[in-house]
């Protein structure tokens, strides 16, 4: 099976709750390689650009307000079957529906403030990683 790339964003609620280290430890313990990482505060326009796929949805403004409300940590991850494995690790978008022991079940407070973003497909993983990191900043693990 080929190595896949996915993008995680440890959201502003993760940073506010001081859970960044614990979430990263869980990600690494699950076998993911960290290939790029930085702490940023997205502008409203940057959040709108990243989440443009949702611009027609009723939650778009609240989502982009939240994502630009404070620091977040985008992280490029690689692993075989990265997309599916990461989505399993983080759990359902709604923490009340997330399986016990998942990151969202353990740390998230709501559907919006759900600790972490994860890419939903290999093509989106590549595209989303490129939104935050030029290719020369991504250190592929061999």
From Swiss-Prot:
A molecular function (GO) term: nucleoside diphosphate kinase activity
Binding residue positions for ATP: 11, 59, 87, 93, 104, 114
Keywords, ordered alphabetically: ATP-binding, Cytoplasm, Kinase, Magnesium, Metal-binding, Nucleotide metabolism, Nucleotide-binding, Phosphoprotein, Transferase
Subcellular location as annotated: Cytoplasm
HAMAP family registered for this protein in UniProt: NDP_kinase
Entry similarity comment: Belongs to the NDK family.
Name the record gives this protein: Nucleoside diphosphate kinase
